[in-house]
């Protein structure tokens, strides 16, 4: 048997979907000679990265966590979103022993239940249906004091779209006859993932101490005031909701705190501030002794708190299977997507496999990435080219964050520059592979940058899309690409190209047929 080409590089262009419409399509508008040449000369097709094809509800846009899980697992991974929704529908959620344990302990001592989470129908980090269910559960179990600390979205939803969600939760509490929204703050603060602890501190002090930049007598009034200050949902400053005659809510000893985000990466920092005894990223005036702090899912194994829906282990994901066959692999990304190309691609595993190396390139320290649309892509590419030339690795998995992170800003010109930068980077990788006889597969985890304006509202479109994503083979072999592929088919495709048998646990099907 002839040796398979080495290395095989999987290039994941984050947020790089395919749209037939040229309108507000940053990919269409960009000058991209390398991409155009690849599409003209190399086998390519489209694969699905949304909805049931990735284990999400029908019509639900994909996201980076889900995308990388499916890409690495080689099977459709039943997502936490669908697990929690199903548990609510089945009634199991309301008896969840971990949540019930914390709530019951607080109720027995006549203490409060605090619900934290992204209040949004976005379905990427959380879903407001889950927050409604949590409020109902607390009330059913006898909690007299139920407080929602609402983080506002505007990133996986239109920039100013929080009002219906706030009104829905106000109505939920009114219907229960108890509980209320206690505070609102933008996800920019509460859900940082880049160690910008000053942002997290603003959220922590709002929730725990009732310390706010602004106060309002209702959640909707708080939102209207934020809009009047020029803030969109994502950036709403710390606001305590204090109805007439009431005081700002604080978290007290003996209270229960339930964090209702199901996606881990943007829930970790705030969780650590609540539960780590030796936490020192910012000074905490108080660290209440809680009846319980519950993570909806496991945000990190190192966070000392129980989770309501523990991970369901995945065996024989691509990284593990390559290691079993003595293959070497490199994972590389900049900070913003490093967790995706390591933890999520490995099916929720923190530690590297035997023969796996990792390179983390710091993301630029700018307020928003439209200010530096190239991000750290050139530096990432430097290291990939070096790795290809060394021929030390059988497989290289790289994530380029630009399409997604710049797409989220809603700034069209910056998104075009991001695509043009990616094109240059791909050109360098293709050239390096050509020299050593390596191969690449280029795909994406979900769409974003191909739709930069919401036609129905005229607002910037900052969220992901349900568009299919490209799948391009780069190399010298003659092969054909089938239609109807999904992200879960990418790992089996890589095994086909490497001449490795597919493990039974991988239920995806190779997208390529050799010969």
Swiss-Prot record:
Highest taxon, organism lineage: Bacteria
Binding annotation for Mn(2+) 2: 14, 64, 445-446
GO molecular function: manganese ion binding; phosphoglycerate mutase activity
One GO CC annotation: cytosol
Protein residues bound to substrate: 125, 155-156, 187, 193, 263-266, 337
GO BP annotations listed: carbohydrate metabolic process; glucose catabolic process; glycolytic process
Record bears the keyword Metal-binding: yes
This enzyme's EC code(s): 5.4.2.12
Catalytic residues as annotated in Swiss-Prot or TrEMBL: 64
Matching CDD domains: iPGM (cd16010)
Catalysed reactions listed for this entry: (2R)-2-phosphoglycerate = (2R)-3-phosphoglycerate
Keywords: Glycolysis, Isomerase, Manganese, Metal-binding
Cofactor notes: Binds 2 manganese ions per subunit.
Chain positions recorded as Mn(2+) 1 binding sites: 404, 408, 464
One Pfam family in the UniProt entry: Metalloenzyme
Names of required cofactors: Mn(2+)
Keyword Manganese: yes
Protein's pathway: Carbohydrate degradation; glycolysis; pyruvate from D-glyceraldehyde 3-phosphate: step 3/5
Function per UniProt: Catalyzes the interconversion of 2-phosphoglycerate and 3-phosphoglycerate.
Subunit structure: Monomer.
Family: Belongs to the BPG-independent phosphoglycerate mutase family.
NCBIfam families according to UniProt: pgm_bpd_ind (TIGR01307)
Protein name: 2,3-bisphosphoglycerate-independent phosphoglycerate mutase
Taxonomic lineage: Bacteria, Pseudomonadati, Pseudomonadota, Gammaproteobacteria, Pseudomonadales
Name of the gene encoding the protein in the UniProt record: gpmI
